[in-house]
């Protein structure tokens, strides 16, 4: 099954972006896991684990009696995730190279499968979710979190914000990324043959010193090589060294706020 091209390939930039993203999204994911019932002793599979933010969160929930296995198609991401987990002292975490779409039950059943910002990049998220759910024991948990990227990112309609949004949206559209995967989760669970999921939606919002403009700037910085290759934007146009400051200047000038990704959480139990 084909997977759409990921929007960034420069590994150190991507590691930095995902770690910064975690500072914004991890509190939302933590609350989702608590609501869904992730608990001590569980064996958890993390889909598309990247540098391991979500895996480390899950490892905190399951404790030393539990186990978290993160899977990602990028060997470098797997290596970085393992390094970060080891440096943080996690002994209940392991990372493996693999594709979400090609998962098998060779290692036995899991108590839960989780994932954040993964299905939006898959050409067939229904099939991937069905296969992932097939790795979970009866009565186990399927819990995923996906964004809606199509809403307003700031209350300020400044030129830098308009240009940034245009670049990122065009890049996602070119890659055929599902920018509304979050609102599509209910239908995706249903099509995958799973019970109707519980749903929540939450976003990090802030003004002044708590404005999360750096998160949106990091997306553009990480995607810059691809945007240049596609002819969407140049390094000079993005000017990554000043982008966050320019975004914040427009927000502060109007006492506006910045809205992080609207993250939809969905969870259900496997029949």
Q: Whereabouts are the PLM-identified features?
A:
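Conserved alpha-helix/loop element of class I SAM-dependent methyltransferases that forms part
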Residues: 23-42, 57
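Conserved catalytic/acceptor-binding region of the Class I
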Residues: 143-210
């Amino acid at each position: 099954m084909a997977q759409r091209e990921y929007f960034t390939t420069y590994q150190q930039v991507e590691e930095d972006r995902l770690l910064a993203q975690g500072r914004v999204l991890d509190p939302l994911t933590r609350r989702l896991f608590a609501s869904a019932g992730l608990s001590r002793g569980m064996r958890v599979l993390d889909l598309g684990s990247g540098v391991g933010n979500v895996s480390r969160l899950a490892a905190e929930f399951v404790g030393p009696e539990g186990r978290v296995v993160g899977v990602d198609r990028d060997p470098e991401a797997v290596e970085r995730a393992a390094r970060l987990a080891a440096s943080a002292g996690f002994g209940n975490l392991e990372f493996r190279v693999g594709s979400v779409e090609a998962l098998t039950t060779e290692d036995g059943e899991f108590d839960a499968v989780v994932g954040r910002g993964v299905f939006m990049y898959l050409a067939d998220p229904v099939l991937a979710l069905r296969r992932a759910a097939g790795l979970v024991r009866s009565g186990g948990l399927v819990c995923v979190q996906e964004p809606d990227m199509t809403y307003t990112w700031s209350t300020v309609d400044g030129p830098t914000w308009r240009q940034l949004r245009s670049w990122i949206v065009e890049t996602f559209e070119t890659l055929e990324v599902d920018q509304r995967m979050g609102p599509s989760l209910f239908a995706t669970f249903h099509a995958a043959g799973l019970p109707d999921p519980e749903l929540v939606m939450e976003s990090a919002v802030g003004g002044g010193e708590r404005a999360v403009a750096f998160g949106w700037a990091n997306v553009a910085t990480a995607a810059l090589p691809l945007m240049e290759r596609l002819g969407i934007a140049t390094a000079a146009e993005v000017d990554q060294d000043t982008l966050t400051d320019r975004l914040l200047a427009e927000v502060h000038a109007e006492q506006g706020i910045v809205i992080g990704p609207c993250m939809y959480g969905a969870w259900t139990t496997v029949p």
